[in-house]
Amino acid sequence: MEEVLSEGVDALAACVDDMAKCLTVSKVTTDRSTKLAINMLQTKRVFQLVSEYDVQRARLDLMEDIEPLLQKLYSKLEKALTKLERERATLSQTFELNKLRFNNQESNPIIDNVKSDPVVIVSSTHEELERLKDLKNRKEELIQRIQELHEER
């Protein structure tokens, strides 16, 4: 009988060891899925606990905080853009005027007594620059006509 009890105790000990091994293996494999399930449940709980009113209120508070900042940034951006646009127009005008001056010097190397007008840079539109080009060309034509009349005499 002692022998049977001893075998029973040994079998029970082996069974407990096997059960402990199974528990450690199942704990390791389910640990990841448990963390995932807990995270999903927490996310679900957050949405269940927060009422729609609280969400709308938080959204409005956020808009009240961020809207003025966005308006400031938008106005700064508009000012910078306006400044860059003026600078571009000025550079374009300077380029056009220098191009006209260069063309004037190339076409009239003989004329020393006629000086070109001083370049005054002001804010102008594309149409004004076109008008200026036309006037410069007209001036050049008139100077050539004057030269021709002087040569005829």
Swiss-Prot record:
Pfam families: DASH_Spc19. Residues 68-153 form a coiled coil. One of its GO terms (biological process) is protein transport along microtubule to mitotic spindle pole body. It is found in: Nucleus; Cytoplasm, Cytoskeleton, Spindle; Chromosome, Centromere, Kinetochore. Keywords: Cell cycle, Cell division, Centromere, Chromosome, Chromosome partition, Coiled coil, Cytoplasm, Cytoskeleton, Kinetochore, Microtubule, Mitosis, Nucleus. Component of the DASH complex that connects microtubules with kinetochores and couples microtubule depolymerisation to chromosome movement; it is involved in retrieving kinetochores to the spindle poles before their re-orientation on the spindle in early mitosis and allows microtubule depolymerization to pull chromosomes apart and resist detachment during anaphase. Belongs to the DASH complex SPC19 family. This is DASH complex subunit SPC19. It comes from Kluyveromyces lactis (strain ATCC 8585 / CBS 2359 / DSM 70799 / NBRC 1267 / NRRL Y-1140 / WM37).
